[in-house]
Amino acid sequence: MTTFQPGRLAGQLAATALLAATCSAFAADAPTTVPSSLGAIGTTPTLDNITMEPGLPSDAKRVYVLDPGHFHVTTTVYTIDGNKNNLLGMTDTGKLANVMLSSDGKFFVTSNTTYSRIARGKRDDYVEVIDAQSHKVLADIDIPEGRFLTGVMNRMASLSTDNKYMLFQQFAPSPAVGLVDLEKKSFVKMMDIPDCYQIFPVPNQSFYMHCRDGSLQQFGYDDKGNLKPMKPTKVFHGEDDYLFVNPYYSNGSGRLVWPTYEGRIFQAKLTDKKVDFMKPFELFTEAEKKANWRPGGWQVVAYHKARNEIYVLADQRAKWTHVTASRYVFVVDGTTGKRLRRIDLGHEIDGISVTQDANPNLYAVSAEAKTLFTFNAVTGKETGKVDELGRAPTISLTMD
């Protein structure tokens, strides 16, 4: 029951009167003209009708930078115009997200993991398809909570060569590859596989994986996720040839370039019919090996198809320091291994990528500087940068 209290009402009326008087006093003292210190900002008219301009369409110089944030629960993809070194947009992603670009550059796909209580609680895995120009979400597809959560490896998820499907790797409770139908915007099936890793798509609904014995095994699949394992290739590297976790692979050409911790370069050309292994070669001379030159970083290799040039991030370093940043890029012929040039980046770099146009950019990402540096890939000259890119960016992606 509410009791009427005249004293409380009188107090409330007095407080209201005091507040009104105070506001009137402030209004009387308010300036009637805009302070000159505000300049043009103070006289800019307000906009009643606001329109959103469309974003820039993707081109050969477009680059996407992934900031995994040192295993933070939320991550970011930065869309950057490599022509002018301008930030075009940002896409929020989940823990250890994978990013995949369509072959025509019109959309990109992210696979994500989030939790109901930020860093704990119920896990939720999903896939988003995002328009590359507007950055609008075109599809949000739920998938089983089985993404392999590890330091981001580009080939733990991939688009099919025709952009119709997305494939992602599951490690536990058993090895499998998940199939997502992007056209129907739906998850299809988890396909059981042997103990193999990394996904390298080829045409006609087929892909290869790298298996523990050092071979590549091919798998075909149909629209319902029925998997057809095929005969594995020969073992192409020895047990002591420790391969980096982020090789270069082109969905369009099937070219695979895979360096080891010591600088040996393995290569192959993958098709839906066969695999042609190329003769491996050494990146460093014997004198350079004695001086402790080794590849290092997180995304250490790139390849320019038309120029047939391999780019490897490297520095003088102690053994087993292969994930630490490097300052130099060695550029070699993709067939013979002949040294073409060495680029001093002038920064500690964690990952590199190269555009595929006639005048290519070399992109170099530094987690420490939180910056994408742009270089002329031929001359090695630094031409620009974009800084303040999150917590610890390590990976960049360009159109295939």
Curated annotation (Swiss-Prot):
Its EC number is 1.4.9.1. Keywords: Electron transport, Oxidoreductase, Periplasm, Signal, Transport. The keyword Oxidoreductase applies. GO terms for molecular function: aliphatic amine dehydrogenase activity; methylamine dehydrogenase (amicyanin) activity. One of its GO terms (biological process) is methylamine metabolic process. The keyword Disulfide bond does not apply. It is found in: Periplasm. InterPro entries: Host-pathogen_enzymatic-act, MeN_DH_Hvc, Metamine_DH_Hvc, Quino_amine_DH_bsu, WD40/YVTN_repeat-like_dom_sf. One of its GO terms (cellular component) is periplasmic space. SUPFAM superfamilies: YVTN repeat-like/Quinoprotein amine dehydrogenase. Methylamine dehydrogenase carries out the oxidation of methylamine. Electrons are passed from methylamine dehydrogenase to amicyanin. Tetramer of two light and two heavy chains. PANTHER family: DIHYDRO-HEME D1 DEHYDROGENASE, PROTEIN NIRF. Belongs to the aromatic amine dehydrogenase heavy chain family. This is Methylamine dehydrogenase heavy chain. The lineage of its organism: Bacteria, Pseudomonadati, Pseudomonadota, Betaproteobacteria, Nitrosomonadales.
